[in-house]
Amino acid sequence: MKTSPIMANNNLHITAMITTALLLLGLSGCATFRPSVPVSNEPQYVAHTSLVNRPRLALVLSGGSLRGFAHIGVIKVLEANGIRPDLIIGSSAGAIVGALYASGMTARELELAAERMDMSLASDVAMPSLGIPWLRGELGLVRGEKLQQFVNTEVKHRAIENFPIRFGAVATNLHSGKPITFNVGNAGLAARASSSVPGLFTPPLIRNHRYVDGQLTSPVPVAAARALGAQIVIAVDVIYPSSHAEMTTPFSVMLQAFAIGAQHIKETELRQADIVIRPEIEPVGQLVFADRAGLIRLGEQATINQLPQLRQVIADR
């Protein structure tokens, strides 16, 4: 049976939308997804109350879509210079890199993990809801379950509280509009929630609430690190500058609105950091699958440039 030109065009359009969603995140996995997470292991926030065991040094990793690969370069230089954080907080793309690093991966292992990140989320496509009661659908084009499984596989299916480095993934509560830091529970689900761009990815349901991308309310979550007791905060900012947007599709317009909101919140958050590392990334579009190795090198160079100041801040505390 031949496919009509109209059907072919529709298929191409759907494929393009799916590809756009995948390119935005740039992360996926190939393992079979195990859909259920026991309620007892769903991510949640547990406040830090001890003054004795406060984290001294926190590494805060921003959102930034594919630009998040630059976070790995930052980690490479910190590791090479013996600078190890006690706490890692990530938002969106930063939550994914942060989860893997906090689980005990070395910088080299992170580079290898980056090479395993592909676009096989195409098999994770969802039928979006049309608002018709009898026709059930998802609240996004991609479920994000493959991403969840990818992260859980990489961290060896350990819960966040069992990581060697304390970790928190910041997501946005879709009901209250407030950020939450998931610092215990299922790591893959926490990273998925933190990375669920609204409209593209289905907001996961966690403890009866829907959660979307942390970049909406806390693009560089310095406040979350301070709330968990961090004394020194290194913040890494790889967020796409809103001034560099190329608005050629409905998705790019949505991303531009997303970026504008993040810029205003970001500047407030960064004022609370002790050191800010900003890799000089060329203004390529968010939907271009960028060169991983090149982004990692840019993260390295930006961190090398900040090393003298960083060492001084640590010595002074």
Locate predicted features:
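Bacterial N-terminal signal peptides
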Residues: 16-28
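Gly/Ala-rich beta-loop-alpha elbow adjacent to hydrolase catalytic centers
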Residues: 90, 94
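Patatin-like phospholipase
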Residues: 2, 29-89, 100-317
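Bacterial N-terminal signal peptides that target proteins for export
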Residues: 2-19
